[in-house]
Amino acid sequence: MQLKKAFWKLASLLPLSLLLFLGGCDKKLAVLNPQGPVAKAQYDLIVWSFLLMSLIIAIVFILFTVILIRYREKPENMDYEPPEQHGNTLLEIIWTLVPVIIVIALSIPTVKATYASEEVPKESKHIKPVEIYVTSANWKWLFSYPEEKIETVNYLNIPAGVPIQFKLTSVGPMNAFWVPELGGMKYTMDGMIMDLYLQADKPGSYLGRSANFSGEGFTHMEFEVEAKTKEKYDKWVKEVQETAPKLTEAKYNEIVKPGVVGRMTFSSHHLSYVDPKSLEYCDYNYYKNKK
């Protein structure tokens, strides 16, 4: 009887816990608001994993409740002593196979989604991707457009409906590049170039941020990704090429020093005089100051 009362007391708290949970849902989470094929594939993976794990939890709690009620102590079985057993082959097979099946059910779609994210989205394989080098520094982001021969700091413009091949690297501590509505994060590391493919299906503004703590200015490492129509994107590129100042080596050396800066736009990029794969690029400011 006491066990039954305790169970119903716990059950009565369920509506309250749901209210508390839903209270944090007044604003849609960016991760659950996919705006591109990569983000959509990862969103589907999250939903599948959540549903599968919810089903498992539901089955466990149902079995737990049934066993508690059915095999609880009663006046008529106070003297019952269960027989001694040394194993149950069927049960041992079940509780070995079930976890294996669960892991397989989670692993297959996860592996497929992971490998798919390393390539141009299949919906856009016929479109040439725009290449953009992403460089993290303390505490800002630099975006270099090699073909367009321009560079921006702390903001990023891309054409909508076109795959973007990001080349991720760093001139400071390891960081992580993340635009939640367009896809998952990936690390930026010294002396390495990591590829990341993302795409925005339609024009809009998307928040990007650092997903790896990198010191006191970490909270300032946010940037805006604005997806434009192809016509507006081409117009913006042309305006930058014609009106923005050149990014000199001295100016670049100043930008990558630890500190917080605002938005900047240049009609050239630092890749013309710094090789991202070189040792010097790993800590550009350190090597420049030694000379």
Swiss-Prot record:
Keyword Transmembrane helix belongs to the record: yes
Localization terms from the record: Cell membrane
PANTHER family: CYTOCHROME BO(3) UBIQUINOL OXIDASE SUBUNIT 2, CYTOCHROME C OXIDASE, SUBUNIT II
Protein name per the record: Quinol oxidase subunit 2
GO molecular function, one term: cytochrome-c oxidase activity
InterPro entries, per the entry: CcO_II, CcO_II-like_C, Cupredoxin, CuRO_UO_II, Cyt_c_oxidase_su2_TM_dom, Cyt_c_oxidase_su2_TM_sf, Cyt_o_ubiquinol_oxidase_su2, QoxA
Endpoints of the signal sequence: 1-28
Pfam families in the record: COX2_TM
Family named by the database record: Belongs to the cytochrome c oxidase subunit 2 family.
CC annotations in GO: plasma membrane
Function in brief: Catalyzes quinol oxidation with the concomitant reduction of oxygen to water. Subunit II transfers the electrons from a quinol to the binuclear center of the catalytic subunit I.
Transmembrane segments: 49-69, 91-111
Main EC class the enzyme belongs to: oxidoreductase
Disulphide linkage map: none
Keyword entries, A-Z: Cell membrane, Electron transport, Membrane, Oxidoreductase, Respiratory chain, Signal, Transmembrane, Transmembrane helix, Transport
Any one Gene Ontology BP term: ATP synthesis coupled electron transport
Species assigned in the record: Bacillus cereus (strain ATCC 14579 / DSM 31 / CCUG 7414 / JCM 2152 / NBRC 15305 / NCIMB 9373 / NCTC 2599 / NRRL B-3711)
UniProt topology in membrane: Multi-pass membrane protein
Catalytic activity, EC: 1.10.3.-
Catalytically driven reaction(s): 2 a quinol + O2 = 2 a quinone + 2 H2O
Gene name linked to the record: qoxA
Gene3D superfamilies per the UniProt record, alphabetical: 1.10.287.90, Cupredoxins - blue copper proteins
